[in-house]
């Protein structure tokens, strides 16, 4: 029993050495990924441009709303201004076509973008207007509460 205890303590003491070796390997992988940044940007731009090209041939409002949502989501973590542009286009089209669910979804996207920029009070005002109802789809309800969690989590952390 005593030998087992000594072995366990010895292994625990060697653990930081092993972790440090792993970190150097992880740094190498990270450096390699950073070197490929231009390639990743090119792939992302091509993907977004393909969606934009497809949008030229779409005539139904429902399909345009789907494409605007794809573009907004594609730009969300990539380029704030472009994401907000497609969110606003989606809001206008959803309101014009009287599509309540898409209007709420674009407001959620707008709220998420505002949260990333620190506009917590503005995000809260939007969230209060679009609280889900029982008849709303479950994915919308989930997204709403997830966004609300993000709002209050960020607000409490950074303010």
Language-model features: locations:
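A "functional boundary" signal
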Residues: 5-6, 16-159
């Amino acid at each position: 029993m005593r030998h087992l205890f000594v072995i366990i303590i010895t292994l625990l003491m060697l653990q930081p050495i092993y972790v440090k070796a792993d970190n150097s390997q992880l740094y190498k992988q990270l450096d390699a990924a950073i070197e490929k940044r231009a390639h990743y940007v090119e792939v992302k731009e091509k993907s977004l441009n393909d969606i934009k090209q497809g949008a030229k041939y779409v005539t139904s409002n429902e399909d345009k709303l789907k494409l605007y949502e794809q573009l907004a989501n594609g730009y969300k973590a990539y380029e704030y201004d472009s994401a907000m542009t497609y969110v606003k286009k989606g809001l206008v089209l959803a309101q014009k076509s009287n599509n309540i669910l898409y209007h709420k979804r674009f407001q959620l996207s707008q709220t998420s973008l505002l949260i990333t920029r620190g506009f917590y009070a503005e995000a809260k005002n939007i969230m209060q207007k679009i609280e889900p109802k029982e008849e709303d789809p479950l994915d919308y309800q989930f997204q709403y509460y997830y966004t609300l969690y993000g709002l209050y989590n960020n607000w409490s952390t950074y303010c």
